Amino acid sequence: SVTADNASETKVREIGQEKSS
């Protein structure tokens, strides 16, 4: 991912993990 999108992408991954959990 682009550095500028790193923060938002990390949040998306964290949210996805919480939902899958």
Curated annotation (Swiss-Prot):
Catalytic activity from the UniProt record: alpha-D-glucose 1-phosphate + ATP + H(+) = ADP-alpha-D-glucose + diphosphate
Coiled coil: none
Source taxon at top rank: Eukaryota
GO molecular function, one term: ATP binding
ATP-binding is among the record's keywords: yes
Statement: the UniProt record of this protein carries the keyword DNA damage: no
Composition bias type Basic and acidic residues, residue spans: 8-21
Region feature (Disordered): 1-21
Metabolic or biological pathway, per its Swiss-Prot or TrEMBL entry: Glycan biosynthesis; starch biosynthesis
This enzyme's EC code(s): 2.7.7.27
UniProtKB keywords: Allosteric enzyme, Amyloplast, ATP-binding, Chloroplast, Nucleotide-binding, Nucleotidyltransferase, Plastid, Starch biosynthesis, Transferase
GO BP annotation list: starch biosynthetic process
Description of how the protein assembles with itself and partners: Heterotetramer.
Name of the protein described by the UniProt record: Glucose-1-phosphate adenylyltransferase large subunit
Organism of derivation: Spinacia oleracea
Upper lineage: Eukaryota, Viridiplantae, Streptophyta, Embryophyta, Tracheophyta
